[in-house]
UniProtKB/Swiss-Prot annotation:
This is Transcription initiation factor IIA large subunit. InterPro entries: TFIIA_asu/bsu, TFIIA_b-brl. TFIIA is a component of the transcription machinery of RNA polymerase II and plays an important role in transcriptional activation. Belongs to the TFIIA subunit 1 family. SUPFAM superfamilies: Transcription factor IIA (TFIIA), beta-barrel domain. Signal peptide: none annotated. TFIIA is a heterodimer of the large subunit and the small subunit gamma. One of its GO terms (cellular component) is transcription factor TFIIA complex.
């Protein structure tokens, strides 16, 4: 399942890089977003593995067919995960007013709760509700992940 998440993150980042001038997103904001997603994915998968270990010790049925690699999930992206604690991580990008409110939009670090990552096809507003059509994504509710090819939803804002 980790490979699916990695592919979706890479696809979203590559599309953002292609249209960065049109949507007014700087390279630094894109890199910060990618790093934040990777950190959260690593934290989520580590907590999922820890929970799985506890379930198997208690004798409950867990996921079948999963094997934990000896390197751990942190190496799934090809190296040590970058964190904001690493010295000099963002010194090339400098401070930017554009991304100053990203932590409010993305949320605070810690428990990610429920999340959905996907591509959108269209968004319409009708009768005070946003009607959305999504494609190629996954939704994580609790500890259960659902992969979907297309989805529709109504949102009240």
């Amino acid at each position: 399942m980790l490979k699916i998440y990695e592919d979706i993150i890479n696809e979203v980042i590559s599309r953002l890089e292609q249209v960065e001038d049109e949507v007014s997103i700087g390279k630094s904001a894109i890199h910060e977003l990618r790093n934040e997603w990777r950190e959260r994915l690593i934290e989520y998968t580590q907590s999922e593995w820890d929970g799985e270990r506890m379930r198997r010790r208690d004798g409950e049925q867990g996921y079948h067919g999963y094997e934990r690699l000896s390197e751990g999930p942190a190496h799934a992206f090809g190296g040590k995960p970058t964190t904001a604690k690493d010295p000099g991580m963002f010194e090339d990008y400098g401070s930017s007013d554009v991304s100053s409110g990203d932590s409010e939009i993305i949320g605070t670090k810690g428990s990610t709760g429920n999340c959905m990552v996907c591509l959108y096809v269209k968004v319409n507003m009708s009768k005070g509700k946003w009607k959305c059509t999504f494609k190629q994504g996954f939704i994580s509710i609790g500890n259960i992940d659902f992969v979907f090819n297309s989805a529709q939803g109504e949102l009240e804002w």
